[in-house]
């Protein structure tokens, strides 16, 4: 990742700390991966606190594929089958079947309906019957071990919201340009600045976690 572009957001460790503070303050975070991987930026929010306004922003400026990152334990609790048995996607992204809240939604498409679905899925006592399948929210199962196991946006989302003190569940969506192309680092950074989001890279988060876990051991 081009460090010059990111320098205004601090050092790699500072960027992670700023991202955690942003999440605690109810703001979003722009998570960038490597140019050699997807080379994309994802807007992320804690599933517990994401507002209808933030969901609307995500739908308006994102790919439209709004994803709910969850753990394997949560997937089992909700009895969500993986979307396919044999995942042949380029990066092995862990899509489950799509979901809709069983109650409190109309068509499931609106920002308010998608927030209702997210909240239903992450509720402490959530049951499989609380969700209909298919729907307009795309759960993603994170790999155990987070970014130290797989350097994906799914794992980064779970790691960040957990480090910030939230349940291990977060919403992500890829940022797109107005012409429908994928936003790259310069566009992602400009968007984050305009919308008061912190910016962090998956590489930053890997280094942060490795350093903290070395210290802990």
Swiss-Prot record:
> Can you tell me which residues bind D-ribulose 5-phosphate?
37-38, 42, 150-154, 174
Q: Which residues bind Mg(2+) 1?
A: 38
What are the GO cellular component annotations?
cytosol
Q: In which pathway does it act?
A: Cofactor biosynthesis; riboflavin biosynthesis; 2-hydroxy-3-oxobutyl phosphate from D-ribulose 5-phosphate: step 1/1
The record places the site described as Essential for catalytic activity at 136, 174
What SUPFAM superfamilies has UniProt attached to this entry?
A: YrdC/RibB
Q: Does the keyword Magnesium apply?
A: yes
Q: Which family does it belong to?
A: Belongs to the DHBP synthase family.
Q: Which HAMAP family match?
A: RibB
Can you say what this protein is called?
A: 3,4-dihydroxy-2-butanone 4-phosphate synthase
Q: Which organism is it from?
A: Citrobacter koseri (strain ATCC BAA-895 / CDC 4225-83 / SGSC4696)
